[in-house]
């Protein structure tokens, strides 16, 4: 591997410390599902203690739905606030500061049972949602800016790997025999204190983003020193030259606001791509598959369906690792297309299997294969790629605003799916996956015609292509647009 493009200890420390925030996001996404019954019992017990009457089913459903959905509301607000922190405090320091929210949420949720307060639990879920929303901007941005061009895709996938590992840990810890029981569920929710503490210990030893130091702070000597440590070489002239060119371009541009992303022809195309890729992740049907998985495993005769669900979490993690190793060879666009096409095929298989399940019980095994296939294809493309490609599509100036918009798109679609899926599933039954198949095909078409290949390109080279296209970008043919990564394919 060429000098400056190798994995160094300092680079691994920086990425590893950052993705602890991604793990927190994944953990808090999955942790609330397993202990639902014991937490609802706690709500009922608290209500009975306060009002001397059992809680009504409608009120209990409302409180539980609020406990789940408030996490996404916090995420929406947090993701939209990314730009307020990263330019003022830096990328690394913003991640460190956000752990205040994680510690506060851990205390509120961990002591909610002792205080007989479901309000503390709900408030804690909102605060950890704020933290997670910030994390979905901070981590991919920081990792993208500290990584060498040749490793940017592979290291960018670590954000998604952290998320799926967090979900898997939550599934395992949520088992009744570990912490998903009546006595230990507060510890399950308060466990977020541990990764927050670890991140506070590790990140002070990680460097600030060299791009932030040079382009935002004009501290060239510090940026040069950081680059030497990150790259493991004394010759960082090419990195510095690329950053200086980006800095000169940024000085010629006025400050980029969120509205400017949509008004300017130069930014309109990349922000549209960023938004649609985020939607392709959340509207792909992955949450629907996890929702259906336990009932499908039960119908197929699996005695402990929860362990089969954990098995799908293992597949989730394993194929994220696969994506990590192939993303720099195959390219982002190619993997995203493969993932979308594979998911559409598996969604059709699931629809057929679920429709014929009552007449042909063996179809349950086909549905299990389809579930594992769906999850695997998700982690090959739509899972990891939308997160880090935002950093690649934008230069230093508009990047924070772009992450705010992309993050808000992701969290909003997550919230909509979370709130609306059960109603759609009741209405459509097993045919619900036809809706996701149509969406996946539409996302495939958009990706094929509009999304460029960014593999092997510097941030400035990618931004230059969009600047060159400007308002006429949409008039380019697919072949011209895809030339962005053509020479890296040969």
From Swiss-Prot:
List all annotated glycosylation positions: 44
Upper taxonomic classification of the species? Eukaryota, Metazoa, Chordata, Craniata, Vertebrata
The protein's UniProt keywords, in alphabetical order, are:
Cell membrane, Glycoprotein, Membrane, Sugar transport, Transmembrane, Transmembrane helix, Transport
Question: PANTHER family from the entry?
Answer: SOLUTE CARRIER FAMILY 2, SOLUTE CARRIER FAMILY 2, FACILITATED GLUCOSE TRANSPORTER MEMBER 1
The UniProt entry lists membrane topology as: Multi-pass membrane protein
One GO term under biological process is: dehydroascorbic acid transport
Return the protein name.
Answer: Solute carrier family 2, facilitated glucose transporter member 1
SUPFAM superfamilies linked: MFS general substrate transporter
Give a GO molecular function annotation for the protein: D-glucose transmembrane transporter activity
Coiled-coil ranges per the record?
Answer: none
Residue ranges crossing the lipid bilayer per the database entry: 11-32, 66-86, 90-111, 120-143, 155-175, 185-205, 271-292, 306-327, 334-354, 365-387, 401-421, 429-449
Quote the catalytic activity from the record. D-glucose(out) = D-glucose(in)
Q: What does this protein do?
A: Facilitative glucose transporter, which is responsible for constitutive or basal glucose uptake. Has a very broad substrate specificity; can transport a wide range of aldoses including both pentoses and hexoses. Most important energy carrier of the brain: present at the blood-brain barrier and assures the energy-independent, facilitative transport of glucose into the brain. In association with BSG and NXNL1, promotes retinal cone survival by increasing glucose uptake into photoreceptors. Required for mesendoderm differentiation.
Instruction: Write out the residues that bind D-glucose.
Output: 160, 281-282, 287, 316, 379, 387
Q: Where does it live in the cell?
A: Cell membrane; Photoreceptor inner segment
Ranges where the record places region Disordered: 470-490
In terms of InterPro entries, this protein maps to: Glu_transpt_1 (IPR002439), GLUT (IPR045263), MFS_dom (IPR020846), MFS_sugar_transport-like (IPR005828), MFS_trans_sf (IPR036259), Sugar/inositol_transpt (IPR003663), Sugar_transporter_CS (IPR005829)
Q: What family does the database annotate?
A: Belongs to the major facilitator superfamily. Sugar transporter (TC 2.A.1.1) family. Glucose transporter subfamily.
């Amino acid at each position: 591997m060429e000098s400056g493009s190798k994995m160094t200890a300092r680079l691994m420390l920086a990425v590893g410390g950052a993705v602890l925030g991604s793990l927190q996001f994944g953990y808090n996404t999955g942790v609330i599902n397993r202990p639902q019954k014991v937490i609802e019992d706690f709500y009922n017990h608290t209500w009975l203690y306060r009002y001397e009457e059992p809680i009504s089913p409608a009120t209990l459903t409302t409180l539980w739905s609020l406990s789940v959905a408030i996490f996404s509301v916090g995420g929406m607000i947090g993701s939209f606030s990314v730009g307020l922190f990263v330019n003022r405090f830096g990328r690394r320091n913003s991640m460190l500061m956000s752990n205040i929210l994680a510690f506060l949420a851990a205390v509120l949720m961990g002591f909610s049972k002792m205080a007989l307060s479901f309000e503390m639990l709900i408030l804690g879920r909102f605060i950890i949602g704020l933290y997670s929303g910030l994390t979905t901007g901070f981590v991919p941005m920081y990792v993208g800016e500290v990584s060498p061009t040749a490793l940017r895709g592979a290291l960018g996938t670590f954000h998604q790997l952290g998320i799926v590992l967090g979900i898997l840990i939550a599934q395992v810890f949520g088992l009744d025999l570990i912490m998903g029981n009546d006595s230990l569920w507060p510890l399950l929710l308060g466990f977020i204190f541990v990764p927050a503490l670890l991140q506070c210990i590790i990140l002070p030893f990680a460097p600030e983003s060299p791009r932030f130091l040079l382009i935002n702070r004009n501290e060239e000597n510090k940026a040069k020193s950081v680059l030497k440590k990150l790259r493991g070489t004394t010759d960082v002239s090419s990195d510095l030259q690329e950053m200086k060119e980006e800095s000169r371009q940024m000085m010629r541009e006025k400050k980029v606001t969120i509205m400017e992303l949509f008004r300017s022809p130069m930014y309109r195309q990349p922000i549209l791509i960023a938004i649609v890729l985020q939607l392709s992740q959340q509207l792909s049907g992955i949450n629907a598959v996890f929702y259906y998985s336990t009932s499908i495993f039960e119908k197929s005769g699996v005695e402990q369906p929860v362990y089969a669900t954990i098995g799908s979490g293992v597949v989730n993690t394993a194929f994220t690792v696969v994506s990590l190793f192939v993303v720099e060879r195959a390219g982002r666009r190619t993997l995203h297309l493969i993932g979308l096409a594979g998911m559409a095929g598996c969604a059709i298989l699931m629809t057929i299997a679920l429709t014929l399940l009552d007449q042909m019980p063996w179809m349950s095994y086909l549905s299990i294969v389809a579930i594992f296939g769906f999850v695997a294809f998700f982690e090959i493309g739509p899972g990891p790629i939308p997160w880090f490609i935002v950093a690649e599509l934008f230069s230093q100036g508009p990047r924070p605003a772009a992450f705010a918009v992309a993050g808000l798109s992701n969290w909003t679609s997550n919230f909509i799916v979370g709130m609306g899926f059960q109603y759609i599933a009741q209405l459509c039954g097993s045919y619900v996956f036809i809706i996701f198949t149509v969406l996946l095909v539409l996302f495939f078409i958009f990706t094929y015609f509009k999304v460029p290949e960014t593999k092997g390109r510097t941030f400035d080279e990618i931004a230059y292509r969009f600047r060159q296209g400007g308002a006429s970008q949409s008039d380019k043919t697919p072949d011209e647009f895809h030339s962005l990564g053509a020479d890296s394919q040969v």
